[in-house]
Amino acid sequence: MSRIGNKVIVVPAGVTVDIKEGNFLTVKGPKGQLEKQLNSDLSITLEGNLLTVKRPNNEMFMRKIHGTTRALLFNMVHGVSEGFSKKLEIKGVGYRAQLQGNTLVLQLGFSHNIEMPLPEGISLDVPKNTEITVNGIDKAVVGQFAAEIRKHRKPEPYKGKGIRYVDEYVARKAGKTAK
């Protein structure tokens, strides 16, 4: 029994869900549109503003894919109605970020600047040169781009320098002590 898969998704006003043959879904909302091909063995139904996912049997694979499909559907509905965001902060002397057109430029203590073009469907806010907010309607793309930004200078445990998520805890280590 999939606890997540059995939950009903409430589709908010202003969001339309179109289910085509073979479980090809199109979700449109005020923030944009997402399309996804889901497993065709599952039955996805829209009754009023309630979206449900049902599986044909209790095989192990069907139980696994049931909850995953429901979570993907919920993320699509949530993304087009409210959107997703990830906040990162930069710590370190001389470390900064700036947005130049459609490119994020990072200065992270290397001999060169790191230039990252924005993927389609992603918008960035850089309120201060040490804060970055990644916004978008696709949760996977937002998380992936935030992880790629963080990858260039992960937080180190001694001084805490690097790029970290705002809610991330970095375990600190004590340095060497003199004898």
UniProtKB/Swiss-Prot annotation:
Q: Which Pfam families match?
A: Ribosomal_L6
Single GO molecular-function term?
structural constituent of ribosome
Q: Which domain of life is it from?
A: Bacteria
**Keywords (A to Z) from UniProt:** Ribonucleoprotein, Ribosomal protein, RNA-binding, rRNA-binding
| UniProt-listed PROSITE patterns | RIBOSOMAL_L6_1
Keyword match rRNA-binding = yes
What InterPro entries does its record include?
Ribosomal_uL6-like (IPR000702), Ribosomal_uL6-like_a/b-dom_sf (IPR036789), Ribosomal_uL6_a/b-dom (IPR020040), Ribosomal_uL6_bac-type (IPR019906), Ribosomal_uL6_CS (IPR002358)
Which GO cellular component term is one of those annotated? cytosolic large ribosomal subunit
Keyword Metal-binding in the entry? The reply is: no
Subunit structure, briefly?
A: Part of the 50S ribosomal subunit.
As for family, the record states: Belongs to the universal ribosomal protein uL6 family.
Recorded hits in PANTHER family, A to Z, give:
60S/50S RIBOSOMAL PROTEIN L6/L9, LARGE RIBOSOMAL SUBUNIT PROTEIN UL6M
Q: What does this protein do?
A: This protein binds to the 23S rRNA, and is important in its secondary structure. It is located near the subunit interface in the base of the L7/L12 stalk, and near the tRNA binding site of the peptidyltransferase center.
Q: What name does the UniProt record give this protein?
A: Large ribosomal subunit protein uL6
Quick one: which gene encodes this? rplF
